[in-house]
Amino acid sequence: MSNSGPILAMRDLHFCYEGHTVPVLQGVTLSIAPGERVGLVGCNGVGKSTLLKLLVGILSMQQGTLEVSGLAMKRENLASIRRKVGYIFQDSDSQLFMPTVAADVAFAAQNYGYPPEEVAARTRRALQQVHIEDCADRPVYRLSGGQKKLASIAGILTLDPALILMDEPSAALDPKNRRNLIEILRGLPCAMLIASHDLDFIYDTCTRVVLLHEGRVAADGPSERILQDGDLLARCDLELPLRFQRG
């Protein structure tokens, strides 16, 4: 695949959890271009988190094709794919386990075998990218919820990912940290797929929205068009973003 090709390409993706008769995902087709910020929205249980887990090999697809930077999703390609794709969990605490912020951010680059001087340089750069360089020597437990989210992102940025996946990144953030996160995400060069119930956050962060309903893609297009279509959102059991609600 050439450099101009999609970072992520999936076609006719299906997944059903063991013991269930109705698939969570039924024929999902989606591609993401380099640098594109895409919001993944839909009601509870529609398969947003499941889809993210399929993209990093936590779950295995049962039908369809999936490629990341031209690499097919196969066991032998998993290590290479995970180096290209960062995954931010909803609970940032699950990704932060070292004694200081700098140690946590450096962990991924160390784990991939970069020499110490390059690990240090990548760590400094990543901390600066998310504006928490002043927290480098701080114990993780002293960070706010927003700072923990940024530390998780910084750790992934040390590997220069082509794509970052995020599951409910604005959850539990106060307004200031929420605005800060939006600004930082909009300034990053990599592609993103952001799953969220917070449609205002998606509107501010993403240029494109993919709407899931009953395991399928119900709509895929510019954020401004989809997130202002009250009839479409209502058919998928969603409400308009707060900024577009009247009364």
Where are these regions (language model features)?
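Conserved ABC ATPase signature
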Residues: 139-143, 147
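Conserved ABC transporter NBD signature motif
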Residues: 64-72, 81
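H-loop/switch region of ABC-family ATPase nucleotide-binding domains
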Residues: 196-197
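Conserved beta-strand-loop-alpha-helix hinge in the C-terminal portion
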Residues: 216-239
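Helix-to-loop junction immediately C-terminal to a conserved catalytic motif
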Residues: 56
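A short, surface-exposed alpha-helical micro-motif characterized by mixed small hydrophobic
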Residues: 202-204
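Conserved ABC ATPase "signature" region
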Residues: 117-135
